[in-house]
């Protein structure tokens, strides 16, 4: 584990010129402030540095704006993109008057959720492994002005470009709709770009595994090794940052919107999770699919609280355009071994050490600190209250008769519904003071502004359906 002294030595050894302090806002966006290296000493790791929190949506008012960034030396890494040698350090956000974690800091909430596992005696380590998908386009144009609303996307990979005239000719080899998983180049047109993305992540300290094209045209995924909950959330922020940066360098644009394209697969973020205690996997046992009773109760908690969790794991109005039947989206709240149509899947493994739950409804717009923490708190509530998840569903849920489908609960159908469920079902999040009413209320208020803007804005499809009526 790196200490402040280790970081200061690394600054000297690498001839670092600047130190970039980063933190995550409630919406999940990485924010930063850059210091000349002369401002970085042991004191900043002990006392932090002040900043104005009033400009961060969902945080403090202007009359109480002072906040404290506390650098976490464990996260120090060199940014591979900046012209001047720059060290990046992820920060916690503290209340300057008390030195306590700020109750609305997503990273602080994630750390408190991890601590709950220990305080309950359930385990001592939580491992998380997200699989975040994304799109890369050559060009994106959008307008949301009152008299000009719409968007346009383009990528040389899109099947709509089979007859487009290109300088040097059109060479074909397009990825067909839902046909991107996963032919070799030249159909897979950004192999080298993904390799650079993965390499940049590795340079920033992320343990990387693989990369590949995804199902939709222009859709991709990079693989990371699992890690402990808060560190994995840190790594997911690096993941998004590297993808945006490398795409930009290539003259392209990456997006983590769950459903930018109608009629093709959306981008999900399946999240694998497990708990360990004294070096042993808590989720391994002799019940269904070689799971422990504790794991089944964990799944029961996820299913019971899924609609409230959606507010964090699927935090955009666009998220619910992905969560519809027919595009491999896990809308049904059921669990199964190997069945990818269930929202909670138990991946097959012969090793007890690899026993885990894969929650499939989250998407990559989720704030990773809040999304991971909310799922963990739901699972812990399931363990505490021995919530029965019911029988496993081992048949293809996509092909069930309508009458059977009606008996299976589903995730939320809109962000408004998710926020309403969060408002009603919040007690499990507040256990141990992990989340509190102040944060939940402020988050609902922040997200409702997005809902209301979306609901009040006329949509191009409405003109298509109703203009001449």
From Swiss-Prot:
Its cofactor is Mg(2+). InterPro entries: Gln_synt_N, Gln_synt_N_sf, Gln_synth/guanido_kin_cat_dom, Gln_synth_cat_dom, Gln_synth_gly_rich_site, Gln_synth_I, Gln_synth_I_adenylation_site, Gln_synth_N_conserv_site. GO terms for molecular function: ATP binding; glutamine synthetase activity; metal ion binding. Mg(2+) 2 binds at residues 133, 214, 221. Its main location: cytoplasm. PROSITE patterns: GLNA_1 (PS00180), GLNA_ADENYLATION (PS00182), GLNA_ATP (PS00181), GS_BETA_GRASP (PS51986), GS_CATALYTIC (PS51987). Residues 14-98 form the GS beta-grasp domain. Mg(2+) 1 binds at residues 131, 270, 358. The activity of this enzyme could be controlled by adenylation under conditions of abundant glutamine. ATP binds at residues 209, 272-274, 340, 345, 353. One of its GO terms (biological process) is glutamine biosynthetic process. Catalyzes the ATP-dependent biosynthesis of glutamine from glutamate and ammonia. This is Glutamine synthetase. The lineage of its organism: Bacteria, Pseudomonadati, Pseudomonadota, Alphaproteobacteria, Hyphomicrobiales.
């Amino acid at each position: 584990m790196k200490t402040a002294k280790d970081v200061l030595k690394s600054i000297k050894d690498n001839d670092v010129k600047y130190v970039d302090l980063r933190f995550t806002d409630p919406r999940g966006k990485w924010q930063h402030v850059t210091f000349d290296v002369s401002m970085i000493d042991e004191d900043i790791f002990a006392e932090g540095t002040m900043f104005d929190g009033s400009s961060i949506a969902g945080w403090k008012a202007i009359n109480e704006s002072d906040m404290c960034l506390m650098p976490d030396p464990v996260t120090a890494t060199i940014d591979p993109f900046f012209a001047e040698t720059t060290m990046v350090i992820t920060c916690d956000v503290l209340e300057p008057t008390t030195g306590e974690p700020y109750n609305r800091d997503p990273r602080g909430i994630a750390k408190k959720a991890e601590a709950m596992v220990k305080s309950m005696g359930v385990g001592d380590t939580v491992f998380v492994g997200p699989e975040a998908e994304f799109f890369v386009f050559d060009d994106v144009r959008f307008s949301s002005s009152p008299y000009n609303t719409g968007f346009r996307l383009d990528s040389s990979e899109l099947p709509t470009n089979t007859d487009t005239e290109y300088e040097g000719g059109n060479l074909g080899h397009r990825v067909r709709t839902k046909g991107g998983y996963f032919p070799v180049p030249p159909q897979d047109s950004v192999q080298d770009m993904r390799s650079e993305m993965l390499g940049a992540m590795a340079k920033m300290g992320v343990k990387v595994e693989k990369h590949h094209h995804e199902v939709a045209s222009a859709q991709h995924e990079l693989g990371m090794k699992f890690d402990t909950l808060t560190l994995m959330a840190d790594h997911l922020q690096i993941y998004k940052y590297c993808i945006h940066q490398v795409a930009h360098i290539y003259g392209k644009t990456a997006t983590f919107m769950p459903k930018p394209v109608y009629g093709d697969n959306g981008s999900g973020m399946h999240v694998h999770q497990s708990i360990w205690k004294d070096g042993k996997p808590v989720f391994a046992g002799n019940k269904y699919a070689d799971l422990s009773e504790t794991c089944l109760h964990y799944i029961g908690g996820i299913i019971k609280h899924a609609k409230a969790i959606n507010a964090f794991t699927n935090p955009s109005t666009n998220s619910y355009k992905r969560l519809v039947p027919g595009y491999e989206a896990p809308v049904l709240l059921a669990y199964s071994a190997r069945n990818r149509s269930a929202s909670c899947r138990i991946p097959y493994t012969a090793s007890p050490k690899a026993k885990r739950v894969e929650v499939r409804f989250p998407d990559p717009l989720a704030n990773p600190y809040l999304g991971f923490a909310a799922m963990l708190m739901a699972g812990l509530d399931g363990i505490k209250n021995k919530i029965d998840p019911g029988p496993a569903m081992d048949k293809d849920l996509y092909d069930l008769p309508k009458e059977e489908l009606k008996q299976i609960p589903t995730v939320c159908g809109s962000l408004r519904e998710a926020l309403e469920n969060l408002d009603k079902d919040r007690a499990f999040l507040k256990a141990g003071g992990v989340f509190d009413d102040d944060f939940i209320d402020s988050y609902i208020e922040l997200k409702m502004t997005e809902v209301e803007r979306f609901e009040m804005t006329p949509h191009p499809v409405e003109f298509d359906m109703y203009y001449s009526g």
